[in-house]
């Protein structure tokens, strides 16, 4: 049976085990051999990264054809309006095409979220707000580009779920190991 690791990837870490040059890699947190990321989180993003020792499962998780939802909480610049939320829900025109519909809602600032190191830039004259967004595709820096396209740049991006797997109470750099009982 395949094994998975659920890692809370810290900010500034790249989603690979080697070749980080000046950036920290996954090898700083995971010493278990034979595990590979199923999908990516860019260096500036935090949260749930799923790794597996099974190629078929890795493909199912990362391939958009399987429509596995990935949910993020996102801190954005300014107070988001309903028009922007609706555009995010129905599809945003990006330079590589229109995004697929997403599930989006405004949320309060998450109380259980850890402090980011380094902290986000703060501009006292510009308020921020939070949204939760679930996407079913995985273009490069997709959510950052989506929020910027509707006029609300992303300041902080934290993935909290991949399919049925949840970040839970893992702190940055911590991981848990699970056994997958069946592949679809």
Task: List where the protein language model places each region.
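RNA pseudouridine synthases
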Residues: 1-184
